[in-house]
UniProtKB/Swiss-Prot annotation:
Keyword Ribosomal protein: yes
Stored PANTHER family: LARGE RIBOSOMAL SUBUNIT PROTEIN BL27M, RIBOSOMAL PROTEIN L27
Native species: Novosphingobium aromaticivorans (strain ATCC 700278 / DSM 12444 / CCUG 56034 / CIP 105152 / NBRC 16084 / F199)
Cellular component terms per the entry's GO annotation: cytosolic large ribosomal subunit
Domain of life: Bacteria
InterPro entries named in the record: Ribosomal_bL27, Ribosomal_bL27_CS
Pfam families: Ribosomal_L27
Protein name per Swiss-Prot or TrEMBL: Large ribosomal subunit protein bL27
GO molecular-function term, one example from the UniProt record: structural constituent of ribosome
Species classification: Bacteria, Pseudomonadati, Pseudomonadota, Alphaproteobacteria, Sphingomonadales
Gene that specifies this protein: rpmA
Similarity annotation: Belongs to the bacterial ribosomal protein bL27 family.
Keyword Ribosomal protein tagged: yes
Residue ranges of the region described as Disordered: 1-21
Length: 89
């Protein structure tokens, strides 16, 4: 009597789609208010001047200007939007 389990019972074979996280606007790029700068899980990068943070930790521009990444205290990374002279006029 053959004792063999029926085939086709693999418990693998699932995967979820990538979440499209990462930097969307890089340093030196121009942004307008509302532009998403970074999509992230947790605060890998903190909001600086003229940058807001959504409930899912997305960083977005609050004003028109140029994106700038910089280091802060405690080794934290920050992203700010520097207002440009022509944008202020």
């Amino acid at each position: 009597m053959a004792h063999k389990k029926a085939g086709g019972s693999s418990r693998n074979g699932r995967d979820s789609a990538g979440r499209r996280l990462g930097v969307k606007k890089f340093g030196g790029q121009e942004v307008v208010g509302g532009n998403i700068i970074i999509r992230q899980r947790g605060t890998r990068v903190y909001p600086g001047a003229n940058v807001g943070m959504g409930k899912d930790h997305t960083l977005f521009a609050l004003a028109e200007g140029r994106v700038r990444f910089h280091a802060g205290k405690l080794g934290r990374k920050y992203v700010s939007v520097d207002m440009m002279a022509e944008a202020a006029e």
